[in-house]
Amino acid sequence: MKQFEVNFDGLVGPTHNYAGLSYGNVASLNNASAQSSPKQAAKQGLKKMKALADLGMIQGVLAPQARPDVDALRRLGFSGSDANVLQQAAKQAPAIFQACCSASSMWTANAATVSPSADTADGKVHFTPANLTNKYHRSLEPQVTGNILKATFANQQYFSHHNHLPDNEHFGDEGAANHTRLCREYGERGVELFVYGRYAFDKSKPAPVKFPARQTFEASQAVARLHGLSDDNVVFIQQNPDLIDQGVFHNDVISVGNQNVLFYHEQAFLDTDKAFAEIKQKYGAGDLHFIKVITEQVSLQDAIKSYLFNTQLVTLANGEMAIIAPTDCEENPAVSAYLNELVSLNTPIKHIRYYDVKQSMRNGGGPACLRLRVAMNETELAAVNQSTMMNDAQFERLNNWVDKHYRDRLSVDDLRDVALLNESRTALDELTQLLKLGSVYPFQKV
């Protein structure tokens, strides 16, 4: 049976803006209050999805969240009509208001953790939405994320959906941004790597001091238990706390894995040798490539600024691997020089493809942030909601949908306009019909 890794990218929502909400994410903070282009951002995302589909990859799309989140504002004491709620919140609590307008769900690497059927005890693909407790604006997402995932992967014969972990910092979970999987073939049993930033219940362990560690060891363990993973195919690795304090807020900012390759910066992990020995032992026979980038080749600052590791590492139809990189990598001399050399080395990585995702990059998210990876066999793939799969016709429909509903320019001040709320709801209501999702948003269930 054929096996695939399918990338599901998040559609950028109509309220895409630069509010600088993500403390610990340097790019997000640096671009706070800049004017955004929701239309351009959505089209950049769609163009990347289509480009991967044209490369022969199987590509899906996940719907965005409904924003502004008026229900969240009502829970916090704002009342009256939707227009009154928006105006009150924007005036009385602007930071909270902006958090309730975030389009951050476009970064679907944080949507959930996914374990393929080859790894799980019951032979199903398992999904656990991330609770994203560390950032208020993202903690609003898990319930609707779960709705969207259930509507996309609806067949209970093949897909198992869990509730997100408790909404508490002790179980802070950031999803696939801190999870990767190494395997020989996508349909074979692999080794799942869970990367965490701190221990919630043991303060004697190393932890960052400046920026928060968003993923806990205890959360990673819980997800592995929920998914029915065996100890024989799970490795827990602590991210280097010093890197978190320098702006490496998720592990996918400093490493990326695919099949038998782990591409990483030498400073990425604690106890690297011990962790890699465990990976090798659990991976078993076969070539396994640990591609280490040393500081002399690419400084930590250049790696973070360019998002060298927040790239997608994909396997092409001919078996060679390609790095899907933001144009920021091409524009950085040290990073560009390294990548040009990398494709000539004796590793599976033979191609670099650059794509413009600057609207996302300015908010602190590169190509890898924009996608959720789901490994499936052909039977499971056939059971996915086919209206969420990218092809020429759906690409055209979604582009037309963006043209019809999205604004060219959006400032933070525009977010209080009830017309934007109504535009967004109209757009998303139409999108759920395009993607055949049913009613996944609270405003559709009134």
UniProtKB/Swiss-Prot annotation:
UniProtKB keywords: Arginine metabolism, Hydrolase
Pfam families: AstB
Signal peptide from the UniProt entry: none
Matches recorded under PANTHER family: N-SUCCINYLARGININE DIHYDROLASE (PTHR30420:SF2)
Species name: Pseudoalteromonas atlantica (strain T6c / ATCC BAA-1087)
Pathway: Amino-acid degradation; L-arginine degradation via AST pathway; L-glutamate and succinate from L-arginine: step 2/5
InterPro entries in UniProt: AstB_sf, SuccinylArg_d-Hdrlase_AstB
Keyword Hydrolase: yes
Binding site for substrate: 19-28, 110, 137-138, 214, 252, 363
Record-level GO BP terms: arginine catabolic process to glutamate; arginine catabolic process to succinate
Catalytic activity: N(2)-succinyl-L-arginine + 2 H2O + 2 H(+) = N(2)-succinyl-L-ornithine + 2 NH4(+) + CO2
Protein name: N-succinylarginine dihydrolase
Purpose: Catalyzes the hydrolysis of N(2)-succinylarginine into N(2)-succinylornithine, ammonia and CO(2).
NCBIfam families linked to this entry: arg_catab_astB (TIGR03241), PRK13281.1 (NF009789)
Active site (UniProt): E174, H250, C369
Broad enzyme group: hydrolase
Similarity comment: Belongs to the succinylarginine dihydrolase family.
Keyword Hydrolase set for record: yes
Enzyme nomenclature, EC number: 3.5.3.23
